[in-house]
Amino acid sequence: IIAIGGGGFGRSVHNTKIDKYILEQCSLERPNVCFIPTASAEDKAYTVNFYSVYSKLNCNPIHINFFQRTPRIDSIINKQNIIFVGGGNTKSMLAVWREWNLDKLLLKAYNRGAILCGVSAGAICWFKQGITDSWASNLNVMDCLDFIPECCCPHYDGEIDRRPSVHDMIKNKIINSCD
């Protein structure tokens, strides 16, 4: 699992270091890479950025949308070597995934050795808990997929309220620690 705190092709299609690193972790010469943009409400520009970067790399890119006519996701996920989850609203993303049983399919993919990765909400989702801004009023801790039995806080160094919020959550024993 590669959890990315922020950045990547969602911010800029010109810096592909993270994307190349992800591909280097796979032993296959031309892996299948699936982008799941659920957290961004399947933002079209985000998906275009994914293809702008990954279609130029040595891989077979594809994406899954849930808010249109949804394909047989099991047949797609089962063929993927790398699954990249985009950023956005973690709470909404996980609710959609659970409705479609994607959470179970991702666990099967993880257990068979697929590389799971993502940025922001796509980083949080793999952990037991994540500190998220899915609620507009404040940061909250939420239960996630629990593939990694820890807590994750993306943007810890990049957003001014993250660090003090994490420290308060630890101090008040809301969480034990945070990665």
Feature map (PLM): residue ranges:
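Glycine-rich anion-binding loop/nest that anchors nucleotide
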Residues: 1-7, 149-158, 179
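N-terminal beta1-alpha1 cap of cysteine-dependent amidohydrolase-like domains
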Residues: 1-86
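Short glycine-rich anion-binding loops that position phosphate/pyrophosphate groups of nucleotides
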Residues: 7, 87-91, 122
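Residues at alpha-helix caps and immediate loop-helix transition turns in enzyme cores, especially N-
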Residues: 14-15, 46-47, 98, 162-165
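Solvent-exposed alpha-helices and their adjacent loops that cap or buttress functional pockets
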Residues: 26-27, 75-77, 108-109, 144-146, ...
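Short, well-ordered alpha-helix to beta-strand connector turns
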Residues: 58, 79-80, 113, 148-149, ...
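Class I SAM-dependent methyltransferase SAM-binding "motif I" and its flanking Rossmann-like core
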Residues: 92-96, 100-163
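A conserved acidic, glycine/proline-rich C-terminal tail/linker
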Residues: 165-179
